[in-house]
C-alpha cells in the first residue's frame, strides 16, 4: 500500500512538473509580441489622384469608408497587395499599398490600374476575394463576381497577371455547373491555393464555402472539376463564433486551405467546425478524379475553437488562425495529427482579432560567414475583425485592420512545431486519423 501511495505521489509531482514546463515555455515565448505590426488602418482609403476626385467619389457613393473590408494580403518584392471585397462604396477591390498616408492609414492604389476597378460591364474585377502569387511571378485572382457578398453581378472567374509587366495573362470564367451546388443553388468561392509545377502545368484549388465543394482548375487544358465531401460541410454545432468577447453567427463550409510542398496534402477546415481534414493531391495532379481515387482523412474536433486561414511552410509546418483565441496555431505534419502536437506561435487579443489571411513569403538573405545566399521564410497575417463586419458595429476612430509579420523560424522556435528527431519518421504521423467520405 505504501508503495502505491509513493507511486501516486511521484506521478502527481511529475505531472505538475510537465504542466509547469509547458506554462513556462509559453510565457517565455511572449506570444503577444511574436508578430510585428507592419501596416494598420482605422479605415481603408484610396489614392484617388486629387482631393477633388476623392470628394466626387464620396458624393456619388462610389466610395464609403465604412464599407471597405480587407480579406486577403500577399507580397511580391516591394509590392504588398490587399484585396478588399466589393460592397457598395468600394471603389477598387484589387489593390497595392502605396507609400502615401491618409487619416485612416496607408492609401491603396488599384492594381493594375483604375480601369480594372470598373466592373459594371464585367470587364474589370468585381470582387477579389482571394489572391495568390506563384513562383513564376504570376498573381492569381479569385473574383467571386459578388456585390455586397450576396448579389451576383458577374460570373465568378480566375485571372492571372504577370507581375513583371502587370499585364493580364489569362482570364477564365468558372462555369455555372462548377461554381454552384446543383442541389441547393448555392455557391461562393472564398479560398485559393495555387500549385505551379511549371508555367503550363499549374493547378488551382478553390474552396466553395456556400456550396460545400472543392473546385479544381487545370491551366494546361482550362478544365474545371467540382468535388464534394461531407468533410467540406459546415457543422451547425459551431456556427456561433466569438472574437474578443463579441459573438456572431455564420454557416460557412470549407474555408481556409493550405497545400504541403512536402506531402502534397491539402489541409482544410470548414469555418464552422473544430475539425482538420486533408486530401492528398497526387491523383488530381494526374487528372484522376474518380471517387475511388480520392481519400479524405482527418480528425474531427481536434481544435478547441474554429480555425480560419491556413498556410504551410516549406518544411511542412501548418499554421492556422484560431478564432476564439485571437491566435495563430501550428502543427508539424511530421508529427502525429493530435491536439497535443499542436501549439500556439502568436496570440494577441488586440491585434489578432480574426486572422482572415496568412501567407508565407520567401525572402532572400545573404550569409557572409557561409558566403552564400539562402531563403528565409517570412509570415504575413491579416486581421480584419470579422465580428465587427458581421455585426456592423465598427468604431472607425480606432485601429480595425492590421497586417503583421514575423520570421517563420522565430515563430516556431521552442514550440512543438520545431524540427524534431522524428522529422523524417512518417510511419505513424496520422495514427489517430479517420477515413471520411
Curated annotation (Swiss-Prot):
In which compartments does the protein localize?
Answer: Secreted
Q: Name one GO cellular component term.
A: extracellular region
Q: What protein family is recorded?
A: Belongs to the major royal jelly protein family.
Q: What does this protein do?
A: Component of royal jelly, a substance produced in the hypopharyngeal gland containing proteins, free amino acids, fatty acids, sugars and other nutrients, which is fed to developing larvae by worker nurse bees. All larvae are fed some royal jelly (also known as worker jelly) early in their development but it forms the principal source of nutrition for larvae destined to become queen bees. Produced in the spermatheca of adult queen bees, along with other major royal jelly proteins, where it may act as a nutrient supply for sperm stored by mated queens, or be involved in energy metabolism.
Query: What name does this protein carry?
Result: Major royal jelly protein 6
Its domain of life? Answer: Eukaryota
Just give the chief location class.
Answer: secreted
User: A Pfam family name for this chain?
Assistant: MRJP
> Which UniProt keyword terms apply here?
Glycoprotein, Secreted, Signal
- Which InterPro entries does the protein's record reference? 6-blade_b-propeller_TolB-like (IPR011042), Royal_jelly/protein_yellow (IPR017996)
Q: Which residues form the signal peptide?
A: 1-20
User: Sugar-bearing residues?
Assistant: 78, 164, 181, 201, 324
Q: In which tissues has expression of this protein been reported?
A: Found in and secreted from the hypopharyngeal glands of the worker honey bee (at protein level); expression peaks at 20 days post eclosion. Expressed in the spermatheca of adult queen bees (at protein level); Expression levels are higher in mated queens than in virgin queens. Expressed at low level in the brains of adult worker bees. Protein abundance does not seem to correlate with transcript abundance.
Induction of synthesis: Unlike other major royal jelly proteins, not down-regulated by the ecdysteroid 20-hydroxyecdysone (ecdysterone or 20E).
Amino acid at each position: 500500500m505504501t508503495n502505491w501511495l509513493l507511486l501516486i505521489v511521484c506521478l502527481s509531482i511529475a505531472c505538475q512538473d510537465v504542466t509547469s514546463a509547458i506554462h513556462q515555455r509559453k510565457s517565455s515565448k511572449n506570444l503577444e509580441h511574436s508578430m510585428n505590426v507592419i501596416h494598420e488602418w482605422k479605415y481603408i482609403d484610396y489614392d484617388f489622384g486629387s482631393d477633388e476626385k476623392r470628394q466626387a467619389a464620396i458624393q456619388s457613393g462610389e466610395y464609403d469608408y465604412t464599407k471597405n473590408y480587407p480579406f486577403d494580403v500577399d507580397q511580391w518584392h516591394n509590392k504588398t497587395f490587399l484585396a478588399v471585397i466589393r460592397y457598395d462604396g468600394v471603389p477598387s477591390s484589387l489593390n497595392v499599398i502605396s507609400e502615401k498616408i491618409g487619416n485612416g492609414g496607408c492609401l491603396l492604389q488599384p492594381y493594375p490600374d483604375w480601369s480594372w476597378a470598373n466592373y459594371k460591364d464585367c470587364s474589370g474585377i468585381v470582387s477579389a476575394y482571394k489572391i495568390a502569387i506563384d513562383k513564376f511571378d504570376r498573381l492569381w485572382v479569385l473574383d467571386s463576381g459578388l456585390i455586397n457578398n450576396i448579389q451576383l453581378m458577374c460570373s465568378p472567374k480566375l485571372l492571372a497577371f504577370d507581375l513583371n509587366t502587370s499585364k493580364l495573362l489569362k482570364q477564365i470564367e468558372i462555369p455555372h455547373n462548377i461554381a454552384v451546388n446543383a442541389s441547393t443553388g448555392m455557391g461562393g468561392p472564398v479560398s485559393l491555393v495555387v500549385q505551379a509545377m511549371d508555367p503550363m502545368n499549374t493547378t488551382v484549388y478553390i474552396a466553395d464555402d456556400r456550396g460545400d465543394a472543392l473546385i479544381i482548375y487545370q491551366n494546361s487544358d482550362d478544365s474545371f472539376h467540382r468535388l464534394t465531401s461531407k468533410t467540406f460541410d459546415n457543422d451547425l454545432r459551431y456556427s456561433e463564433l466569438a472574437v474578443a468577447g463579441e459573438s456572431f453567427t455564420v454557416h460557412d463550409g470549407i474555408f481556409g486551405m493550405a497545400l504541403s510542398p512536402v506531402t502534397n496534402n491539402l489541409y482544410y477546415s470548414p469555418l464552422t467546425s473544430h475539425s482538420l481534414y486533408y486530401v492528398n493531391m497526387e491523383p488530381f495532379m494526374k487528372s484522376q478524379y474518380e471517387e475511388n481515387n480520392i481519400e479524405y482523412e482527418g480528425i474531427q474536433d481536434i481544435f478547441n475553437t474554429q480555425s480560419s486561414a491556413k498556410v504551410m511552410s516549406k518544411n511542412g509546418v501548418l499554421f492556422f488562425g484560431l478564432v476564439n483565441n485571437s491566435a495563430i496555431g501550428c502543427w508539424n505534419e511530421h508529427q502525429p495529427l493530435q491536439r497535443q502536437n499542436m501549439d500556439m506561435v502568436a496570440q494577441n487579443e488586440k491585434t489578432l482579432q480574426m486572422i482572415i489571411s496568412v501567407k508565407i513569403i520567401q525572402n532572400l538573405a545573404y550569409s557572409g560567414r557561409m558566403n552564400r545566399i539562402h531563403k528565409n521564410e517570412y509570415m504575413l497575417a491579416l486581421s480584419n475583425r470579422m465580428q465587427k463586419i458581421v455585426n456592423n458595429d465598427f468604431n472607425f476612430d480606432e485601429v480595425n485592420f492590421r497586417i503583421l509579420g514575423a520570421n517563420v523560424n522565430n515563430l516556431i522556435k521552442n514550440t512543438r512545431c520545431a524540427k524534431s528527431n522524428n522529422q523524417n519518421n512518417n510511419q505513424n504521423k496520422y495514427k489517430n486519423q479517420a477515413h471520411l467520405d
